[in-house]
A protein has these predicted regions:
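Mid-to-C-terminal alpha-helical segments outside catalytic/metal-binding sites
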Residues: 130-167
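Active-site metal-binding loops of divalent metal-dependent hydrolases
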Residues: 39, 63, 79, 86-87, ...
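Short acidic/histidine-rich active-site segments
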Residues: 105-127
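Divalent metal-binding pocket/active-site signature
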Residues: 1-77, 97, 120-129, 144-146, ...
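Short, structured coil segments at secondary-structure junctions
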Residues: 77, 102-103
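Solvent-exposed polar/charged
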Residues: 29, 100-101, 140, 159
Length: 167
């Protein structure tokens, strides 16, 4: 499950969210597990809390959708950017730029199903089978074959989540 900051209309106050986020940061630090961050239009609050808290082993910015300056700051802090279908949307050139500049070890791809359906299926319910379209877009941005990106993000996921792939 994710935790984080959401400045949407029907969300708890940022103070309540911050308290929950700090609890989850402590839990991630104590357990050695990755911290999966949800962020919607709350970049400044989120970055402030993360800068002011203990650093978990891995911080993943799930369904990354923030501006390029936030991507750069997040990457500088060692956070992982997880790209969803929104990276394929025509208007999201900054997300594609973030995919280009991210160090290889700081990239993941995801579906965020049932939301953020990638092109060419935008508007339909997102399905796990569509993650290949997101991966293909990120691969193209990085000048990689989709298979190479698949190997890269599989290795990253195994490292971040402590999964032994038996290879």
């Amino acid at each position: 499950k994710d935790t984080g900051a959401d400045d949407g209309e029907e969300t708890p106050s940022i103070e309540v969210q911050e308290e929950a986020l700090r609890f989850h940061i402590d839990l991630a630090c104590e357990s050695g597990k990755a911290l999966m961050i949800h962020n919607r239009e709350a970049d400044a609050d989120l970055l402030r809390v993360l800068a002011d808290a203990p650093q978990p082993e891995s911080v993943i910015l799930h369904c990354f959708s923030s501006p390029l300056d936030v991507a750069k700051e997040s990457l500088d802090r060692g956070y992982v950017l997880s790209f969803a279908g929104n990276v394929t949307f025509k208007r999201n050139e900054e997300l594609r730029e973030a995919a280009r500049i991210a160090p290889p070890e700081q990239i993941l791809v995801e579906t965020d199903a049932p939301y953020m359906t990638p092109e060419p299926f935008r508007g339909a319910r997102n399905e796990p089978a569509f993650v290949g379209y997101t991966a293909a877009c990120v691969a193209e941005q990085r000048g990689l074959a989709p298979e190479a990106l698949g190997e890269l993000v599989t290795g990253n996921a195994a490292r971040i989540y402590g999964i032994d792939l038996g290879m």
